Amino acid sequence: MAGGGGDLSTRRLNECISPVANEMNHLPAHSHDLQRMFTEDQGVDDRLLYDIVFKHFKRNKVEISNAIKKTFPFLEGLRDRDLITNKMFEDSQDSCRNLVPVQRVVYNVLSELEKTFNLPVLEALFSDVNMQEYPDLIHIYKGFENVIHDKLPLQESEEEEREERSGLQLSLEQGTGENSFRSLTWPPSGSPSHAGTTPPENGLSEHPCETEQINAKRKDTTSDKDDSLGSQQTNEQCAQKAEPTESCEQIAVQVNNGDAGREMPCPLPCDEESPEAELHNHGIQINSCSVRLVDIKKEKPFSNSKVECQAQARTHHNQASDIIVISSEDSEGSTDVDEPLEVFISAPRSEPVINNDNPLESNDEKEGQEATCSRPQIVPEPMDFRKLSTFRESFKKRVIGQDHDFSESSEEEAPAEASSGALRSKHGEKAPMTSRSTSTWRIPSRKRRFSSSDFSDLSNGEELQETCSSSLRRGSGSQPQEPENKKCSCVMCFPKGVPRSQEARTESSQASDMMDTMDVENNSTLEKHSGKRRKKRRHRSKVNGLQRGRKKDRPRKHLTLNNKVQKKRWQQRGRKANTRPLKRRRKRGPRIPKDENINFKQSELPVTCGEVKGTLYKERFKQGTSKKCIQSEDKKWFTPREFEIEGDRGASKNWKLSIRCGGYTLKVLMENKFLPEPPSTRKKRILESHNNTLVDPCEEHKKKNPDASVKFSEFLKKCSETWKTIFAKEKGKFEDMAKADKAHYEREMKTYIPPKGEKKKKFKDPNAPKRPPLAFFLFCSEYRPKIKGEHPGLSIDDVVKKLAGMWNNTAAADKQFYEKKAAKLKEKYKKDIAAYRAKGKPNSAKKRVVKAEKSKKKKEEEEDEEDEQEEENEEDDDK
């Protein structure tokens, strides 16, 4: 329903809400009284149905709003259909942006729609798009349908229905004239009248309750003659309109006094006789939508040329969504009186259950039944369902795959499958009577269940079918033998009185069945020859060809000479080898989410390794992998390798893949130039030569003389002596190492940032005037010698504390003496500093500064000269 049934759903609701209007369109033109009465009653029915739907809508507003999880396309569809204004649409959108729940917004919209409730509101609510986007609306829609069907008012009570049924039965028994016919009405079923089918195109109402109401109104308002005349004219007009269409909904029932059989002509055009004439003679309107009660019992076989047309109509309009429950409780005696039989149509996609409680029926008391949803289905000819269905199933198991084209079309053409029973019959005999309704039952993946009372009859039929099919397997062509005192559903045991149409179909199908028999025999001979070859090759005992090709729990397939596939020579026999990997693949772990909002060009990047988090500093990372460039959350510094170990990923030994930034590994960031390639610093390795001359002399000297102090001048002399004894090739190795170290030094110096050192103290002129002391310091200079004399062991801090205590305890008058003295010294300092600044720096001070600078330069020059001399001496020694 949600996939494409939006148009169907709204159409069905529309038909349920206005059924009387649909029926009004097909009344005869001359029946003005009936038309006037229908017009008056139409308003009452419409208002009643409107109230039912409106109350159900009002009660289920909360459920509808809860089923709609998002505003699109619900609000947009209502706005496009002009059911809500643009202002209301914008207000609803603003409410959703302000975090108001969508269900609350939808409920407010439904409350506004309640004020102007009409059919377009339901059409917009249950549209195709809404049913796809909001699947929870499906059961709400079904609730609307159920309420309409359940609460639809019935104009007649149950007693009147029983009287009408009894009147119908009496009219059929007596076979009176046209006055005895009445319009047959059908009470509503539990399921929708045309669920899963296309609504009628001719405008006829499919709901049974409205048809029943119309018939009741006709009965009450007109006399018996007028009633029969009006109903006959109405049915004639409806039958003429519905006849050309493919989805007819009305079937005429013809009752003959001389024969108890009933016939429902096919609405499709036939070759011999048109059903339109019979509709003019005896027209009884029957809605085949919802069938409650029908009984087809104890019928006699009759001949009709339109049987083939009926079977074709059922074949092409096969419905796969109905449950057919046939219940017939028969008496042991056989009568020619027709009794009602119940046919229930319930929810789609179920299994048909056939219950036959009386196994003692005679061949003249065969049952037939058929019910469909919207397509016209014809009452079947007399037959035995129990034996025919078992015969068809057993024959299907043994003759599966006779022809590829036939097997594909067999699901739709059930009469062709039934006619294949001529394979077991003589060529001169007639074919059995087959059920025309089995085409509607033969649906893929459908099961049949039979009651326990039929088990004995079914088992007897299956044994005879096994006997018939065994002759085909032997390829002898003999006729099947029939046990005594047992009924069989095959061709030889079926009663006479077959219609001429059946004879024609049976004769036309005998040619194809004989070809199938020849194919089966040829197939058996071919498999016997293959068995001989297999015996010669494998030295095994001879086995029957058909049994060899058969496997356990698999149906036997008979291939014809035309469609048999030749086996390729290069194709290997036996089972195919498993070429797939036998090892179970390791399941991939959950992917690490990637953060696209990180700016990788920052100098500091957040990194993670396992559950440990930290911050990577690019400036430190540039200096090398041995530098501690990652700071954890607890302010600890780590190298990349140490941070990898800290995150419990030390076993991988690949920090470029273990450490991630925003979900990306450091390797990816370095490849994309977001991180610089850090210089790899390796441990210094001491090269060893064959003569042990490339050993570090400093380390060797320490090992030999661990307690002796090493003088650098003496050590250089020893190194120069060993350098002279080394060959040129060995010196080249050291020269290469020196060049590599120099290049490494130059590369590091480009990115080296010297640490910020302390600022140099400004040069102070010793001849400059000094600042005067404060009053407290003058007090301390006077009393400090006294305290030290009294307490010689006191520290400086203790002395200062005591002096501070004494200063605080001194009276203000005593403090004035020190304060006045400090003020005089301050005035003198001001005069001296002013005179010093006016004169400028003295020459002596300038000379001292110049001398200090010269001495520094001289020291640097002397050190450079010494280095150059040492290099020259080393070069001379090499020469």
Curated annotation (Swiss-Prot):
GO terms for biological process: DNA damage response, signal transduction by p53 class mediator; maintenance of protein location; negative regulation of DNA-templated transcription; negative regulation of endothelial cell migration; negative regulation of protein export from nucleus; negative regulation of transcription by RNA polymerase II; negative regulation of viral transcription; positive regulation of transcription by RNA polymerase II. It is found in: Nucleus; Nucleus, PML body; Nucleus, Nuclear body; Cytoplasm. Residues 176-200, 229-238, 466-482 have a biased composition (Polar residues). Keywords: Acetylation, Coiled coil, Cytoplasm, DNA-binding, Host-virus interaction, Isopeptide bond, Nucleus, Phosphoprotein, Repeat, Transcription, Transcription regulation, Ubl conjugation. Residues 677-753, 769-837 bind DNA. The modification Phosphoserine is found at S18, S157, S171, S180, S228, S331, S362, S394, S407, S409, S410, S451. The modification N-acetylalanine is found at A2. Homodimer; isoforms are able to heterodimerize. Interacts with members of the HP1 family of nonhistone chromosomal protein, such as CBX5 and CBX3 via the PxVxL motif. Interacts with ETS1; the interaction is direct and modulates ETS1 transcriptional activity. Interacts with the MRN complex which is composed of two heterodimers RAD50/MRE11 associated with a single NBN; recruits the complex to PML-related bodies. Interacts with HIPK2; positively regulates TP53-dependent transcription. Interacts with CASP8AP2; may negatively regulate CASP8AP2 export from the nucleus to the cytoplasm. (Microbial infection) Interacts with Epstein-Barr virus EBNA-LP; this interaction is important for EBNA-LP coactivator activity. This is Nuclear autoantigen Sp-100. It comes from Homo sapiens.
